[in-house]
Amino acid sequence: MDLRYNKYLGLNHNYTENNCITLIDSIYKNELNSNVFDGLWEYLDLPGGKPKDGRKWMKRFSVDSLETWASTVATKVNLTDLQEYDVIIFKSGRLVPTHFGLYLWANKFIHLPEGGFSHIDVLTQEWRDQIASIWRWNGINT
């Protein structure tokens, strides 16, 4: 296991402070020295990625609108091409983005589920069936 991620494990989910996107933002800032998600917060009118209105903020955008923003800073990749730091957007059946995860290695990703704690999980078929898209930030050196 890569010890770099230990400091991101066990964070308590709270929409106004720690959520699935702010976890990824924190990893990008600390590990990649990237502020790429600052543009997302501006795009979503969500200062710092911390909504004041709890879960309601997720109704303000769709997978399509999120992918429109992502396409300006990242490249869409296939599930078979996953690399460390790729961002996974999960969806509900209504194409509403419901969750975000960050691919790490060997079929594992880190995420912060609603009502839970951040942890590393296996990208099982159940998770794969919920993937809307996967994005690789253009600043990643491959």
Protein language model features and the residues they cover:
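General N-terminal targeting signals
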Residues: 25, 30, 99, 105-107, ...
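Short acidic alpha-helical/loop segments enriched in Asp/Glu that coordinate divalent cations
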Residues: 35-45
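Short, Lys/Arg-rich amphipathic alpha-helical interaction segments
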Residues: 108, 113-142
